């Protein structure tokens, strides 16, 4: 399997390499977001990400992964995740998810270290409903991240996310359970699974 089953513990030096990959991914996403506007194709959004990633010395960890043909995923409106860039022309009011990643190679060890992130973009004048959906999702993410300050187990992240959504909005919004977050490091997809919802099994312990 390409997915490592055990949780990978990193050294400080390895975390620094991951930070390099994360910065490259973030700046490439900045370029992709800036390119995403009415009249632009999702393929052009992909090209903006790729151009910046390469300029900064990163290598795509999406392209060629299980034969994936692009450097980002572009999911528009009803598409949940993993949409493939192409000739779709973005329109005023669309909601676009851009998911991309990059890796760097540690010159001391020749090992890869990966970054992977996503952004949601409201194209032009999106509806209030779509703007609220994006805002609620972002805030839920930050509640999950904040939970890490005191969490003992990985499952507390999903618990915090679900608690925020249900306590603030009741049943107005649901949480998709078909896809989950994941660990990252010397590979793009690694243990542990990071759920966005609460489950009985709280998963592995969090180690400093």
PLM ranges: what are they?
Residues 1-208:
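Active-site neighborhoods and metal-handling regions in enzymes and metal-associated proteins
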């Amino acid at each position: 399997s390409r997915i490592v089953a055990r949780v990978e513990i990193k050294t400080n030096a390895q975390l620094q390499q991951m930070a390099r990959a994360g910065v490259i991914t973030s700046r490439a996403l900045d370029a992709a977001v800036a390119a995403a506007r009415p009249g632009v194709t999702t393929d052009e959004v992909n090209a903006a990400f790729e151009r910046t990633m390469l300029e900064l010395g990163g290598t795509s960890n999406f392209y060629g992964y299980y034969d994936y043909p692009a450097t980002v995923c572009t999911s528009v409106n009803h598409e949940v995740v993993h949409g493939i860039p192409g000739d779709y022309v973005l329109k005023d009011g669309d909601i676009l998810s851009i998911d991309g990643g990059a890796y760097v190679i540690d010159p001391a060890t020749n090992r890869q270290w990966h970054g992977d992130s996503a952004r949601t973009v409201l194209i032009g004048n999106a509806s209030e409903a779509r703007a609220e959906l994006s805002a609620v999702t972002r805030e839920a993410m930050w509640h999950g991240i904040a939970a890490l300050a005191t969490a003992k187990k990985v499952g507390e992240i999903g618990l915090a996310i679900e608690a925020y959504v249900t306590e603030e909005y009741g049943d107005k919004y649901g949480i998709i359970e078909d896809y989950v977050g994941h660990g990252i490091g010397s590979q793009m997809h690694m243990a542990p699974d990071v759920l966005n919802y609460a489950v009985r099994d709280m998963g592995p312990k969090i180690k400093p």
